[in-house]
C-alpha cells in the first residue's frame, strides 16, 4: 500500500463537474493499493497517518498530528502510485490490485480512519476525478507499507 500524503489548507475532488468531497485544513491522501495489501497494511498506514506529526506548532516545528490541529482527511484512490516505472517509457501496473480488491481495501482504509475518530471525505473509487488542493508548505510525504 502506498500513500502520498500532502498537508493542505484545503482540498477537494470533483467528478463529472460536481464536488463530491472537500476538506479544509488537513491532509490529502492519495492511496495506491497493491495486490498483496490487506488488513495489516490498512491498520499500519491508518495508525501512522493519525499519529504523524506533520503540522506546525506555535514555534513552526512539525510537532502536531492531524487530531491535535482538528484537521480533516480527504482520501482519493490513485492506482498509478503502484506503477513500475523502472523500465521503458510506459508504466507497468502488475503490482496493482484488481479493481475489486483495490476498492475493498480502499473502503476498509477509509473505515479504519473514521473508526479512529477522523473526519474523512472521499473521492469515488475508479472514477475520472479532478483533485484540487492548496499544499501547505509545501509538505508532502511518501509512505510505503
Curated annotation (Swiss-Prot):
SUPFAM superfamilies membership: DTD-like
GO CC, any one term: cytoplasm
Alphabetical list of InterPro entries matching this protein: Daa-tRNA_deacyls_DTD, DTD-like_sf
Predominant place of localization: cytoplasm
Enzyme class, first EC level, given as a word: hydrolase
Keyword annotations of the record: Cytoplasm, Hydrolase, RNA-binding, tRNA-binding
Membrane spanning stretches: none
Enzyme Commission number: 3.1.1.96
Short sequence motif Gly-cisPro motif, important for rejection of L-amino acids: positions: 137-138
UniProt subcellular location: Cytoplasm
Pfam families named in the record: Tyr_Deacylase
Record's subunit section: Homodimer.
NCBIfam families in the record: D-aminoacyl-tRNA deacylase
Family: Belongs to the DTD family.
Function: An aminoacyl-tRNA editing enzyme that deacylates mischarged D-aminoacyl-tRNAs. Also deacylates mischarged glycyl-tRNA(Ala), protecting cells against glycine mischarging by AlaRS. Acts via tRNA-based rather than protein-based catalysis; rejects L-amino acids rather than detecting D-amino acids in the active site. By recycling D-aminoacyl-tRNA to D-amino acids and free tRNA molecules, this enzyme counteracts the toxicity associated with the formation of D-aminoacyl-tRNA entities in vivo and helps enforce protein L-homochirality.
Entry protein name: D-aminoacyl-tRNA deacylase
Species in which this protein is naturally found: Alteromonas mediterranea (strain DSM 17117 / CIP 110805 / LMG 28347 / Deep ecotype)
Amino acid at each position: 500500500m502506498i500513500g502520498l500524503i500532502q498537508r493542505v489548507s484545503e482540498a477537494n475532488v470533483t467528478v463529472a463537474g460536481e464536488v463530491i468531497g472537500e476538506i479544509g485544513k488537513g491532509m490529502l491522501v492519495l492511496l495506491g493499493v497493491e495486490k498483496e495489501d490487506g488488513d495489516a497494511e490498512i491498520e499500519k498506514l491508518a495508525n501512522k497517518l493519525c499519529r504523524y506529526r506533520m503540522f506546525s506548532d506555535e514555534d513552526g516545528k512539525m510537532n502536531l498530528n492531524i487530531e491535535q490541529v482538528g484537521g480533516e482527511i480527504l482520501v482519493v484512490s490513485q492506482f498509478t502510485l503502484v506503477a513500475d516505472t523502472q523500465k521503458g517509457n510506459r508504466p507497468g501496473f502488475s503490482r496493482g490490485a484488481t479493481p475489486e480488491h483495490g476498492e475493498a481495501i480502499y473502503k476498509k482504509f477509509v473505515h479504519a480512519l473514521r473508526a479512529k475518530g477522523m473526519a474523512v471525505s472521499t473521492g469515488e473509487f475508479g472514477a475520472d476525478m479532478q483533485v484540487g488542493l492548496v499544499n501547505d508548505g509545501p509538505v508532502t510525504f511518501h509512505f510505503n507499507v
